């Protein structure tokens, strides 16, 4: 019925909205981590001075400028970047999963419809993403520089 179809559309829009919001907050938290280390270490190099974008740029900044090498070594880095990639599929591809990304979705049990490769996430998936992001950031904020860096 049209009511069922409407409910399905609202549900997927809600899950997509939560995914987009979570990844935006993740990226802002990582950027904040970089700013904190810049200020605490009295560093002259800023995050914007490092090539790249998003999580990879922040990881490069933390490693090369701050001296934290463990950020990308975290046990859930691959899962976190897969969540980010799902967000990118929603934003840039209408929620359609590209064929080369399907193995990652399969590895982490992230659903998509076989017939049209549409990303299919439920509330339980969103909660798993949320918990993984919180755990990752908790560990990230505990990392300390292992090398001395000069401002």
Which stretches of residues belong to each language-model region?
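Flexible secondary-structure boundary motifs
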Residues: 20, 28-115, 120
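Amphipathic, Lys/Arg-enriched alpha-helical patches that create a basic surface
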Residues: 103-151
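Charged, amphipathic alpha-helical oligomerization/scaffolding segments
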Residues: 21, 25, 82-85, 89, ...
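Aromatic-acidic/polar surface patches that form glycan- and anion
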Residues: 11, 15-19, 122, 126-129
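Charged alpha-helical initiation segments
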Residues: 1-15
